[in-house]
Regions:
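Bacterial Sec-dependent N-terminal signal peptides
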Residues: 1-40
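Short, ordered, surface-exposed loop/turn motifs in non-cytosolic proteins
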Residues: 37, 44-59
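A short, amphipathic beta-strand motif
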Residues: 37-43, 70-72, 107, 118-119
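Hydrophobic beta-strand segments
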Residues: 53-57, 84, 121
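A short, solvent-exposed loop/turn motif at the edges and junctions
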Residues: 57, 85-96
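Short, acidic Ser/Thr/Gly-rich low-complexity loop/linker segments typical of extracellular
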Residues: 61-71
Length: 370
């Protein structure tokens, strides 16, 4: 009897040790996947630390504000194709392209030289109110979410119409701050370039070409509001990241997407269009041979391999234009090379007013009071 009890006790202890080992391995795996990005921000000229600088993962709600010693710390649970941006009023924004593999301990930022380029304006043709309205239509969009947006520092925006090139040009010496009341976010956008070139000589008429370069982060100002959470979910499910995440996980059909050629009713099966495999921190997507055009057409002068219609419901018809036969998608639904694909139609029309953080639904947002 004593021997039997010892055997049972020994088995129990062995099972407990195995359980604790597996539990510890789970914690180790989680900690290995997570990364903590740290560093110190310095003024390049005087070599002093810079407090109050925003340091963020581009396009996300993951950020920190440097302390009195210029230090920052950002936790990211997965490696993604996103840069790290340092922004401070009075300084040029600085970008670290691959912070997950090559983040320096010290990042230097330089004071901004304030100057506007040559401005060619046809005097009296358009009021500032008209220019701002045209800018908002192309910058924020015209949806319910976009119409709820308020530019909180609109007076600091420099805007003019170049009458020689029929181009609306917008600049700002500081981040443009946008309150999106519909989605419960405050957006901070460093706008390096935003130009809207119209096909005719009238502001806001025709389908324009838009050139812009920017970086952005989101402050979650209403993280527990159920109505706003439902709005976010609805907006996200019509977005490009949602489509790309579904594609990367072989869940396009499950997510309600149909693929077709020029929106005809002969809907292509997902597996007949793409082959998806694992590739380190990305999903590798190969465009199947049957979809590759032998006589490559062009989109704004750029040759492309294929073009597919994307349908999710009656109000969400889009097109995806494939400039390559192979592309890579990270866990946030970002492309390793953004120029590999282009979207037109519904998804192509979405602007900053309908944008959510790239880490939406994956990483917890940070927020601070304003």
């Amino acid at each position: 009897m004593l021997v039997e009890r010892k055997v049972k006790h020994s088995k129990t202890m062995k099972i407990m040790r195995i359980f604790l080992l597996l539990l510890s391995l789970c914690f180790i795996t989680g900690s290995l996947n997570a990364q903590i990005l740290t560093g110190i921000i310095y003024d390049r000229e005087n070599q002093e630390s810079v407090p109050g600088a925003y340091v963020y993962i581009e396009g996300s709600s993951l950020f920190d504000i440097t302390n009195e010693e210029g230090k920052f710390e950002i936790k990211v649970n997965t490696t993604v194709n996103a840069s790290l941006v340092v922004s401070h009023i009075g300084y040029n924004s600085t970008t670290v392209l691959d912070p997950f593999t090559s983040l320096p301990d010290t990042i230097f930022i330089e004071e901004k030289a304030f100057s506007l380029g040559e401005i060619v304006v046809q005097a009296g043709r358009y009021s500032r109110k008209q220019l701002i309205k045209a800018f908002c239509n192309e910058f924020l969009g015209t949806s319910s979410a976009a119409n709820s947006c308020v530019i909180e520092n609109e007076d600091n925006i420099h805007i003019w119409f170049n009458s020689r090139t029929n181009t609306l040009i917008t600049e700002c010496d500081e981040p443009i701050i946008i309150l999106n009341r519909y989605l419960g976010f405050r957006l901070y956008i460093n706008l390096e370039k935003f130009e809207v070139e119209y096909p005719g000589r009238q502001l806001g008429v025709g389908l324009p070409l838009i050139y812009f370069k920017s970086s952005i982060f989101f402050n979650d100002i209403d993280p527990i509001n159920r109505r706003i959470a439902e709005r976010r979910k609805s907006v996200f499910e019509g977005s490009r990241p949602f489509f790309l995440r579904a594609l990367a996980n072989n869940q396009l059909e499950k997510s309600g997407y149909w693929l077709s050629d020029n929106f005809n009713k002969n809907v292509s099966k997902i597996h007949e269009c793409f082959t998806v495999t694992d590739s380190l921190d990305f999903k590798k997507v190969i465009v199947n041979q049957e979809l590759r055009s032998q006589n490559r057409a062009t989109f704004y002068g750029i040759p492309y391999w294929s073009k597919l219609g994307i349908t999710r419901d009656d109000n969400e018809n889009s097109e995806i234009i494939l400039f390559t036969d192979t592309f890579y998608i990270d866990s946030w639904g970002q492309l390793s090379q953004p120029d590999d694909l282009a979207f037109t139609g519904y998804m192509g029309s979405l602007r900053f007013g309908d944008q959510l953080p790239l880490n939406y639904g994956i990483e917890s947002s940070r927020s601070f009071s304003q």
